[in-house]
């Protein structure tokens, strides 16, 4: 069981920008399976482009709350750990994560809002409380709370889509690309305009996030990926997180319990 496991998971989601147990190695997504990012010619912002971009944004999952039960394989520099995760989201408000070992013992808990990142490390009895900009130690400063939600759900990142977004048809799929100063946002959508692949790349900072989405199932008449595989590189660390969503409940009441025991050491 590794110490500080949730701090590493939060760092990983931060690289996104956040998201130990019995060890079980899993095969990571081979490089050949990751769609290649193609050089795109800048198209004219015509009606066809606008219709496509509106359609992509229109297929984003719309919800008030989500409750997700997941199995996860976290691999940091080839050290693999299997854990269970409960993820609860209040749209544009809070992301709550509970991490348990396979024996059912909770080892960590986190509460992320647009203003703060809070972590209970039950392995070491430590409470970490940081402002949201703590994640910028790991990722580009353009990353927002909404970006984190999009990564977990496979939504297109609407905050990075504009008339400057370039489009290119690739078979039945469409590749889209937006350049934002040093950060490049690439993603691929299928015929239903659901995101299959996301890449956030900041070459100047040496940071990259790749996410693949598969196994789309209908929840409340909306297609949501149930397999999410993330691979990131930042600060000389290679991290992967393989999430398998076992159950998703939408728009129910969700509690976000977060009580700090008196015995915990507080780190700000």
Task: Annotate each language-model stretch with its function.
Residues 69, 80-88, 93, 107:
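Beta-strand-dominated lipid-handling architectures at cellular/organellar boundaries
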Residues 18-21:
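C-terminal motif of bacterial Sec signal peptides marking the signal peptidase cleavage site
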Residues 94-145:
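An acidic-aromatic
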């Amino acid at each position: 069981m590794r110490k500080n496991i949730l701090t590493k998971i939060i760092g990983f989601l931060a690289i996104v920008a956040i998201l130990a147990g019995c060890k079980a190695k899993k095969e990571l997504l081979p490089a050949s399976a990751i769609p290649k990012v193609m050089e795109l010619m800048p198209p004219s912002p015509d009606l066809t482009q606008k219709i496509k971009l509106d359609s992509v944004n229109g297929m984003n999952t719309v919800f008030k709350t989500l409750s997700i039960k997941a199995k996860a394989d976290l691999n940091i520099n080839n050290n693999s750990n299997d854990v269970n995760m409960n993820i609860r989201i209040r749209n544009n408000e809070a992301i709550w994560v509970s991490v348990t070992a396979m024996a059912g013992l909770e080892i960590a808990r986190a509460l992320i809002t647009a203003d703060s990142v809070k972590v209970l490390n039950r392995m070491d009895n430590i409470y970490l409380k940081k402002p949201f900009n703590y994640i910028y130690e790991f990722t580009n400063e353009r990353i927002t709370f909404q970006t984190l939600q999009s990564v977990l759900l496979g939504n297109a990142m609407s905050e990075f889509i504009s008339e400057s977004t370039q489009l290119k048809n690739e078979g039945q799929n469409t590749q889209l690309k937006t350049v934002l100063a040093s950060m490049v946002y690439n993603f691929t959508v299928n015929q239903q305009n659901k995101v299959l692949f996301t890449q956030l790349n900041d070459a100047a900072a040496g940071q990259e996030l790749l996410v693949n989405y598969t196994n789309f199932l209908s929840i409340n008449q909306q297609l949501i990926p149930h397999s999410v595989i993330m691979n990131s590189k930042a600060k000389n660390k290679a991290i992967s997180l393989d999430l398998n969503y076992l159950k998703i409940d939408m728009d129910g009441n969700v509690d976000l319990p977060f009580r700090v025991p008196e015995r915990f050491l507080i780190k700000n």
